[in-house]
Amino acid sequence: MDLDAIIKEAETQINVAQDASTLDAVRVDFMGKKGRMTELLKGLGKLSNEERPAAGQKINQAKQQIQQLIHQRGELLREQEMNSKLAAESIDVSLPGRTTEMGGLHPVTRTINRIESFFAELGFSVKTGPEIEDGFHNFDALNIPANHPARADHDTFYFNPDVMLRTQTSGVQIRTMEAEQPPLRIISPGRVYRNDYDQTHTPMFHQVEGLMVDKNVSFTQLKGILHDFLNNFFEADLQVRFRPSYFPFTEPSAEVDVMGKNGKWLEVLGCGMVHPNVLRAVNIDPEVYTGFAFGMGVERLTMLRYGVNDLRAFFENDLRFLKQFK
């Protein structure tokens, strides 16, 4: 038997093994139950008693040498496999980290929050109501009779003659006065709907309306509150004027303008003293209580505050536009 040749062949096969399964096949070929070294040990019985010990020793030494080669190759393959995994999973610490982009409040939401914050400091609470409204709360109780132009089909989205999408949040004021007794100080922000769509109108938009009902409420109080609100909202000492106007639910009524940077008056909201008929509709005695109401378009104020020219931009979900307000 040529043990040196067997060891040399085993070493060659072990060194060319590139994975654990190939190496294990080499081990079985040489060291398994039917392997070459096992067969050599079985052949010792054919030798004389004098030859057997020396031959057995040489075979065992060769077996140990092959086992050592297999072990070393196995360690090397495991190390290579680990290095390969680590290289694949490595983190390049010089690579800039991935930032998590934070969202921001929509400009309309920012405006509503700003309005609510100001009036909360004056003791006004926030009230909400249904967007699908009935004729009484949307029109009748607001001194808008059946033949009034505001009730025309081209302005209002009707489900049936007495159920519609609300055209203003004034219905919230009616519901509040039905449920609570004066004194009252509320604002009612929310979505409203009118059949109109152009650069300054959308079918759905946001309003904030306010109401104060108590004894001896005056137009002077209304002017003072709205003047302070506009200066606070626009963060400027504005020139403000109250221009006589008409609303069926207030008398007297006024529209409020502010002087723009271009030297022209800009309409920003409407207001007036609550009409006695509105108070009577909710069983409040107009001989005892008076009140004022005001209403403003949120998108209109947002456009003026941020210099936006097209109201429709607020509803187009263009991130290039919205990211400017973060």
Swiss-Prot record:
State the disulfide connectivity: none
Q: Which keywords annotate this record? A: Aminoacyl-tRNA synthetase, ATP-binding, Cytoplasm, Ligase, Magnesium, Metal-binding, Nucleotide-binding, Protein biosynthesis
InterPro entries recorded? aa-tRNA-synth_II (IPR006195), aa-tRNA-synth_II/BPL/LPL (IPR045864), Phe-tRNA-synth_IIc_asu (IPR004529), Phe-tRNA_ligase_II_N (IPR004188), Phe_tRNA_ligase_alpha1_bac (IPR022911), Phenylalanyl-tRNA_Synthase (IPR002319), tRNA-bd_arm (IPR010978)
Q: Which GO terms describe its molecular function?
A: ATP binding; magnesium ion binding; phenylalanine-tRNA ligase activity; tRNA binding
One Pfam family assigned to this protein is tRNA-synt_2d
- Compartment(s) of residence: Cytoplasm
Main subcellular localization, coarse class?
A: cytoplasm
- Magnesium listed as a keyword: yes
Could you say which EC number(s) this protein's record lists?
6.1.1.20
Swiss-Prot/TrEMBL cofactor(s): Mg(2+)
In its UniProt record, which GO terms are filed under biological process?
A: phenylalanyl-tRNA aminoacylation
Q: Which CDD domains match?
A: PheRS_alpha_core
For the ligand (Mg(2+)), the binding residues are E251
Q: How is its cofactor bound, per UniProt?
A: Binds 2 magnesium ions per tetramer.
Its Gene Ontology cellular component terms are: cytoplasm
User: Could you tell me what reaction this enzyme catalyses?
Assistant: tRNA(Phe) + L-phenylalanine + ATP = L-phenylalanyl-tRNA(Phe) + AMP + diphosphate + H(+)
Q: Does the keyword Cell wall biogenesis/degradation apply?
A: no
- Which protein are we looking at? Phenylalanine--tRNA ligase alpha subunit
Which organism does this record belong to? Pseudoalteromonas atlantica (strain T6c / ATCC BAA-1087)
Q: What is the lineage of its organism?
A: Bacteria, Pseudomonadati, Pseudomonadota, Gammaproteobacteria, Alteromonadales
